[in-house]
């Protein structure tokens, strides 16, 4: 039986601009370094014992035509100057034998920090609930983060986000963020 549990993963992001919507997505994938691969979108689990490696190291381990399992976020606009973002949030448990969470989030009108924090918040909330850590969705991010720190169960949260404004001439603008799992 195939062991398809990822041992490593890396984060990447990109943006693309073109008159054609699909081509702008292709350019975003090129900017992210993974255009020459076949992406398979999967659900949002950070595998137990998986190691987060650098983008550079991850890109060195892939080859053209390879099937890549990814959790990704993509957002597109052809409205001039419209702010758009795509983000993937990560929440890792302290116990490396447990799985963590990855979350996808797209937004219009948010800064890179706002979108990234929200994606991170989603992943952390999913992890907290799976670990039985109580949380109040109405608390602000800093209060929730403090609650999770006190529990001692959540090791690390982070995100990768690509944010830009729509092309001034109305060309399609795509933003893309991904966690790429390497099996």
UniProtKB/Swiss-Prot annotation:
The keyword Lyase applies. It comes from the Archaea. Binds 1 pyruvoyl group covalently per subunit. Pfam families: PvlArgDC (PF01862). The modification Pyruvic acid (Ser) is found at residue 44. GO terms for molecular function: arginine decarboxylase activity. Its cofactor is pyruvate. It catalyses: L-arginine + H(+) = agmatine + CO2. Keywords: Decarboxylase, Lyase, Pyruvate. It is an enzyme of class 4 (lyase). Signal peptide: none annotated. The record marks 43-44 as: Cleavage (non-hydrolytic). InterPro entries: Pyr-dep_his/arg-deCO2ase, Pyr-dep_his/arg-deCO2ase_sand, Pyruvoyl-dep_arg_deCO2ase. Its EC number is 4.1.1.19. The keyword Lyase applies. HAMAP family: PvlArgDC. This is Pyruvoyl-dependent arginine decarboxylase. The lineage of its organism: Archaea, Nitrososphaerota, Nitrososphaeria, Nitrosopumilales, Nitrosopumilaceae. The gene is pdaD.
